[in-house]
Each structure stands twice: as C-alpha cells, then as structure tokens.
Amino acid sequence: MTNLILIFAAQILLFYAVASVGDELGRTMNGKHLGPYKKEKLTHLRVYWHNSVNGRNPSSVMIQQPVLNSSLSGSITMMDDPLTFDVPRNATVVGQAQGMYVAAAQGEIGFLMVMNFAFTTGKYNGSTITILGRNVVMSKVREMPVVGGSGIFRFARGYVEARTKSFDLKAGC
C-alpha cells in the first residue's frame, strides 16, 4: 500500500512538472517585443532572376539526374542565380536567387521551387524572401507563395508572380 501511495505521489509531481514546462514552451508573445515588425507593410518588388544552366559559368547545376530518360521528372537542380532590378543580364546585381528546383511533373515541365531571394545591396541588404511553390515553366504567369523572410522581410507573406522575359535554348538562359 505504501508503494502505491509513493507511486501515485510521484505521478502527481511529474504531472505538475510537465504541465509547468508546457506553459513555458507555448506562451503568448507581447507585441512590444516585435520592435519594428509589429506593423505590417506592403512592399511590391520587381526583380529579375537570371537562370543559366550551361556555358562557362552556369548559375544552376543539376545535382540529380532524371529518374527516367523520357522526362525531367525526378531531377534536382541547385541554383545561385543573380537578381537584378532590370532586365539585361549585365544589369547591377542586387542579390541572389538561391535554392533548388525539383522536376515534379511528368506530363509537363513543372518544378517544385524552394528558394530565397537574398538581397546584398541597398536598404534590403542582408534580408531574404523565402519562396516555396509550383512553377509550371510553360505557363505565361506562374504564382508561388512567399512563406517567410528575414531581416526587413521578417514574417513576410504574400505571393510571387513569375513571367519568362526571354529564353535562349542554345545559350541555356
């Protein structure tokens, strides 16, 4: 009987210890601790990311070949593409589009895009925008969700609209 009482008392103490730890892990945050991020701002950016898959200095490299030779499906490509605020490839670079794209469609050219727009100049220097979504390359407009960010874009949410401005199959860009 004494052992039963000790076990019961130990269970009660353990329950209270776990319950009090649980309260500390999931507490509501006071808005004053968010600093400059407590107010939402709307920012509209127009950037151009220049993807090059071949040539002397490709910005994207396939690291996993397709599973089947009949489609790109299953291939994985890592990218570190220059970002600019203007169309020409020789425009001033303001950051990098870094991440990967995975060929995830069998009947079309469709990719799962996982990337950060990492800005390296101006007021956005050191900030990133994180994008995760589906990119069907042959569609005129592709929409992908913004799932977060860092720096000035902390707590970012929204969407990206991708449009192909130019495509040169021979040059690979």
From Swiss-Prot:
Q: Which GO terms of the cellular component aspect does the record hold? A: apoplast
The protein's role, per its UniProt record: Dirigent proteins impart stereoselectivity on the phenoxy radical-coupling reaction, yielding optically active lignans from two molecules of coniferyl alcohol in the biosynthesis of lignans, flavonolignans, and alkaloids and thus plays a central role in plant secondary metabolism.
- List the Pfam families hit by this protein, alphabetically: Dirigent (PF03018)
Which UniProt keywords are given for this protein, alphabetically ordered? Apoplast, Glycoprotein, Secreted, Signal
Q: Superkingdom of the source?
A: Eukaryota
What is the protein's given name?
Dirigent protein 8
Leader sequence residues = 1-22
Q: How does it assemble?
A: Homodimer.
